[in-house]
């Protein structure tokens, strides 16, 4: 199983580190070239919480990240999700991909849940899951037990 994590902030970089370093999966981490977080990871392969294994493919090419994975994890600002998903659906083959949202919040203008936003933009509801907790990256990386869950329409 291959994962792509779209968004290289704290959660995105942590999830990539966890899936590769702790679980042994093949992982691609995508970030925008203009992102400070991406530049830091590109230049040092680390941030304040994790050091990325050399096996993690780090890219600013969205097509490469989408094509790489069986499962796509999106970890971006909730307020940017609609436009981001609209671009994904319009420009990339997502039919056989599972999408996991690892972000919290509601879309501010509409008050809609993030899964609703994805469905409205053309992602099959049976291919969407949410990964939520209470959880803090610094606790996970320091070995402090946390609880997170993944849920979806597709039981």
Where are these regions (language model features)?
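NAD(P)+-binding Rossmann beta1-loop-alpha1 motif at the extreme N-terminus of oxidoreductases
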Residues: 1-60, 68, 87
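Conserved SAM-binding loop
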Residues: 29, 58, 73-74, 150
């Amino acid at each position: 199983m291959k994962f792509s994590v779209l968004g290289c902030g704290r959660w995105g970089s942590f999830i990539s580190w966890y899936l590769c370093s702790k679980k042994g999966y093949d992982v691609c981490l995508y970030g925008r070239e203009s992102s400070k977080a991406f530049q830091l990871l590109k230049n040092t392969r680390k941030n304040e919480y994790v050091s990325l294994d050399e096996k993690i493919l780090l890219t600013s090419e969205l097509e490469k990240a989408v094509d790489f994975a069986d499962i796509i994890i999106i970890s971006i600002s909730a307020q940017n999700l609609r436009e981001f998903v609209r671009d994904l659906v319009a420009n990339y083959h997502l039919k056989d991909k599972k999408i996991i949202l690892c972000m919290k919040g509601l879309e501010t203008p509409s008050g809609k849940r993030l899964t609703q936003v994805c469905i409205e933009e053309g992602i099959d509801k049976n291919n969407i899951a949410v990964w939520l907790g209470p959880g803090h990256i610094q606790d996970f990386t320091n070995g402090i037990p946390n609880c997170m869950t993944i849920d979806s329409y597709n039981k």
